[in-house]
UniProtKB/Swiss-Prot annotation:
Region ranges (Disordered): 177-201
Gene Ontology molecular functions: protein dimerization activity
Role: Involved in cell shape and neuronal morphogenesis, positively regulating the establishment and maintenance of dendritic spines. Plays a role in cellular protein transport.
Residue span, RH1 domain: 14-108
A Pfam family hit: RH1
Main location (coarse class): cytoplasm
Protein's recorded name: RILP-like protein 2
Gene transcribed to yield this protein: rilpl2
CDD domains reported in the protein's UniProt record: RILP-like
Chain ranges of the RH2 domain: 121-197
InterPro entries: DZIP_RILPL, RH1, RH2, RILP_dimer
Length: 201
């Protein structure tokens, strides 16, 4: 509505209003109005001074060239302004669409979003970590027991296992070695890391 009132006011004031405008507010029509004003002034000069008509015509060509450049600049800036407005409108529509879709895709209060590119992201569940810690504690206990047994063997409190092997051979007793049982049974740590390595490849 305001633009229509501005156009009516501009028509009432004539083309001279274009010269008073801010250069960044000029339109192509304003450039045509300026061209009309300059052309009228050049005509007046050429009519009054008959001897300077060749100078006026040279000046007229230069002014026409400047006005053509001004027109090109105004066209380019108005296109840029329109492109920016279109881009703004597109972005507004995109934001509105995302806001509408946002609650559907939103994360609940007991959920967490994980950035897969973050090197410090959590990789295991709490239960897996608990299992690993329990396994580690069991292995520590076994290590302490083995170190104690080794210390006992070294000090001579427990007879060496070579003596026990000889007596077992004499009795011809067949037993399954504990190492075979251990190899059949994968530890939680090994299975966890083998699962993780399988995922990465």
């Amino acid at each position: 509505m305001e633009t229509e009132q501005d156009e009516v006011a501009q028509d009432e004031l004539g083309p001279e209003i274009a010269l008073d405008k801010d250069p960044f507010q000029l339109t192509v029509e304003d450039v045509y109005d300026i061209s009309h004003i300059v052309g009228q002034d050049l005509l007046k000069i050429s009519r009054e001074a008959r001897g300077v008509s060749s100078l006026v015509s040279d000046l007229q060509f230069k002014i026409v060239r400047v006005l053509e450049m001004l027109e090109a600049l105004v066209n380019q800036s108005s296109l840029s302004a329109e492109e920016l407005k279109m881009e703004r409108d597109n972005l507004k529509a995109e934001v509105e669409r995302l806001l509408k879709d946002g609650p559907q895709m939103g994360v609940g209060p007991d959920k967490m979003v994980i950035d897969l590119t973050d090197p410090n992201r959590p990789r295991f569940t709490l239960q897996e970590l608990r299992d690993v810690l329990q396994e580690r504690n069991k292995l520590k206990v076994k290590l302490l027991v083995a170190q104690d047994e080794l210390q006992c063997y070294k000090s001579g409190i427990i007879p060496s296992p070579d003596d026990q092997i000889v007596t077992l051979e004499n009795e011809s007793m067949i037993t399954c070695s504990p190492r075979e049982n251990e190899s059949k049974e994968k530890s939680t740590v090994k299975s966890l890391f083998s699962f993780k390595q399988g995922k990465q490849t």
